[in-house]
């Protein structure tokens, strides 16, 4: 079986639609040879490899053999610098400009490896806006909470996927984490004991300190802090889960329904690297508020 991708795969609503369409058309195949044709694809935002990789891993979990064919040179170069194509028979090439945040898959028990990964490949980049030590600590914990949420809430057995990219000409850095789990809608619906849409579930999960995490130590502050930070920074926060898509930018939020559901949850954060402001915490939060 062969499936073709469109001309552009960007980290936006249309990019999610393109990849979830691929999943919808291929997810029921078993023991097949599946070719993903990239002949028409002239641009692929590297951080979307987290989403693409999760989908292809899911297809492989159905005992299919998955191959990428007709990859154009520019796209091959992008996806070889971050190590994505090494999983599909290609050789990595040096990232001489140091703009790639490598594509990785983590098991749910790999929390220490993920922590080290975000520390070395994302947090310590000198392109990030200047932050106080306290805020940098909270920022790091908020990114880690995305992984923690995937472990605690998704019930995934196929792992957690991440990738990122610095775009110097556009003055931004994007980082994406995807899991193949039950999704936000199911978790929130069960917690509220009310069947709600995926859009409504994402909106609920991003409001104040709402969380489905139970016990004496609450969660939920991670997305709140990231949202407040990107409001000031001029960045963007996106979440896709099931057939829900949510985006926050320019201090406002919007949501849409995806035509084809994503089999888990994706969180994408985009940071404006042209931001010359310095940031500190406005309140003295306790580290235990997040974990």
Question: Could you tell me what each predicted segment is?
Answer:
Residues 1-7, 97-107:
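Short amphipathic
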Residues 9, 42-45, 132-140, 219:
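Conserved phosphate/pyrophosphate-binding and hydrolysis machinery centered on Walker-type P-loop NTPases
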Residues 85-101:
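A glycine-rich helix N-cap at a beta->alpha junction
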